[in-house]
Amino acid sequence: MKNSMIIFRKQVKDTGKNIALCIQFVMFPMMAVIMENAIKIDNMPPHFFVGMFAIMHLGMAPLNVMTAVISEEKEKNTLRMLFFGNVTPAEYLLGIGGFIFSACMVGAVVFGILGGYRGMQFIYFLLTMAAGICVSMLLGAVIGIRCKSQIAATTIATPVMMIFAFLPMLAMFNDGIAKVADFAYSQQIQLLINGLTAGTEVKPESLLVVAVSLVAATGLFIHAYRRCGLA
């Protein structure tokens, strides 16, 4: 646990020096704040931009940052030096994963406040966001572990995060895309958030898709780790 906290603090410092990674965490919360206050359109659903940018945030930030951090440190052989220094792979993953999850959840709190959620609604919103963030983090870890260079990892991560981040938005305008999007965890989280805003009942199929996605992402991560390792 001590080593994990060291990795956590190291990642905080490294991210503070990397503007590109910092932007990933603040971009969509800032856009939501601006759009929620600057744009008012008749018949627009309440807090429309909160839901839209929240999904983009959980679909892009954790996946992209997790991929970038792991692939960069693999390419620079930083991980090998850490492991020689008695840091285990589990401690490393817990450290960087804890930081990325915490940073993304700060954004989720911003979305929750903007959305006007209170009490149990606010907690439910954060739990829903946390589930999506965890899936995205695991997918990012898989890509980072499997790729041998940061360029290769970015090449693969970009289309993956674009799909999960923008599929729910595209599904609003096309029924065909909506049918495909129903299998994506980001779409079901969008529906859960919409239902929370509208005060409707939770659909079991939405929870099922998110749960299956979390299990599948965990399985992919375990397979990638056993096959490729971190160093």
Predicted regions located by residue number:
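Short alpha-helical transmembrane interface motifs in multi-pass membrane proteins
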Residues: 51, 59-64, 94-95, 120-128, ...
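N-terminal Sec/SRP start-transfer signal
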Residues: 1-21, 229
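Hydrophobic alpha-helical transmembrane segments of multi-pass membrane transport proteins
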Residues: 46-111
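A structural motif at transmembrane helix-loop-helix junctions in multipass membrane proteins
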Residues: 22, 130-168
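Terminal transmembrane helical anchor/hairpin motif
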Residues: 168-215, 219
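Hydrophobic alpha-helical transmembrane segments of multi-pass membrane transport/permease proteins
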Residues: 14-40, 49-65, 156-171, 208-218
